[in-house]
From Swiss-Prot:
Organism of origin: Mesocricetus auratus
InterPro entries per the UniProt record, alphabetical: TBP (IPR000814), TBP_CS (IPR030491), TBP_dom_sf (IPR012295), TBP_eukaryotic (IPR033710)
The protein's name: TATA-box-binding protein
Region described as Disordered: 1-21, 106-138
Residues that, per the record, bind DNA: 146, 182, 197, 236, 273
Length: 318
């Protein structure tokens, strides 16, 4: 009897040399699902391509959504800028000074990456004039405190003779090369030079200044000089007033740097140089205002009406 025939059927393949590579029972391998024998069978996954396509589609959809959101944000910013610009033009047409705040400064260009759409709070603000109604009137009239006028007497003068013979006259050529003369009515002071020029100061009105200059010329005539009254002219007018509220000078000088200077260590007042009319104002924290440099009274009043809305915008609220 053959030895191979005595073996069970499932072991006959293993016992024969030819059957060593031909197993008698199916062999399961994790690398070969349900393969028979030792011949490798390729693994086929029909769902792998569809999964990759779905992932690519999802990524494309997400990118499209992000682009749409950025476009919507840019469009919203542009609309806000257009609306603020129209509001400012409307305010300018109504006589108001347009305002500019941080929330109205927007970026309309396409923004890459994580660039913020709105500026940071540290963005510097453009200096502007505080907005107040143009029709608002202060109701305050500056009072004239001093008027400086000049006149030409038209002749050479001997200052020593004038100082010796005239009343209320003093002359010290080492200190000042002019005779200083004073009268009581109107209460003024005159500086008389040897060239015949005279400066009159201290008058409270134009009429008082002219009257005082004529009185000084008459005194010189009585001393024997052929004095005349030529080329009378007001050179400077000084006025003052009180706005009745304290003023933030630090904020005023920051927003009007090209017109003002403020050095509290040197002088307690803010110096404001107005362009039109050409007036210099001294503004104090207490609310007192001094106006100088005017040739006519109307310039004093006009300058104060121009500066009053600005001062009201910097009123202290404490």
């Amino acid at each position: 009897m053959d030895q191979n025939n005595s073996l069970p059927p499932y072991a006959q393949g293993l016992a024969s040399p030819q059957g060593a590579m031909t197993p008698g029972i199916p062999i399961f391998s994790p690398m070969m699902p349900y393969g028979t024998g030792l011949t490798p069978q390729p693994i086929q996954n029909t769902n792998s391509l569809s999964i990759l396509e779905e992932q690519q589609r999802e990524q494309q959809q997400q990118q499209q959504q992000q682009q749409q959101q950025q476009q919507q944000a840019v469009a919203t910013a542009a609309a806000s800028v257009q609306q603020s610009t129209s509001q400012q033009s409307t305010q300018g047409a109504s006589g108001q000074t347009p305002q500019l705040f941080h929330s109205q400064t927007l970026t309309t260009a396409p923004l890459p990456g994580t660039t913020p759409l709105y500026p940071s709070p540290m963005t510097p603000m453009t200096p502007i004039t505080p907005a107040t109604p143009a029709s608002e009137s202060s109701g305050i009239v500056p009072q004239l405190q001093n008027i400086v006028s000049t006149v030409n007497l038209g002749c050479k003068l001997d200052l020593k003779t004038i100082a010796l013979r005239a009343r209320n006259a003093e002359y010290n050529p080492k200190r000042f090369a002019a005779v200083i003369m004073r009268i009581r009515e109107p209460r003024t002071t005159a500086l008389i030079f040897s060239s015949g020029k005279m400066v009159c100061t201290g008058a409270k009105s134009e009429e008082q200044s002219r009257l005082a200059a004529r009185k000084y010329a008459r005194v010189v005539q009585k001393l024997g000089f052929p004095a005349k009254f030529l080329d009378f002219k007001i050179q400077n007018m000084v006025g003052s007033c009180d706005v009745k509220f304290p003023i933030r000078l630090e904020g005023l000088v920051l927003t009007h740097q090209q017109f003002s200077s403020y050095e509290p260590e040197l002088f307690p007042g803010l110096i404001y140089r107005m362009i039109k009319p050409r007036i210099v104002l001294l503004i104090f924290v207490s609310g007192k205002v001094v106006l100088t440099g005017a040739k006519v009274r109307a310039e004093i009043y006009e300058a104060f009406e121009n500066i009053y809305p600005i001062l009201k915008g910097f009123r202290k609220t404490t």
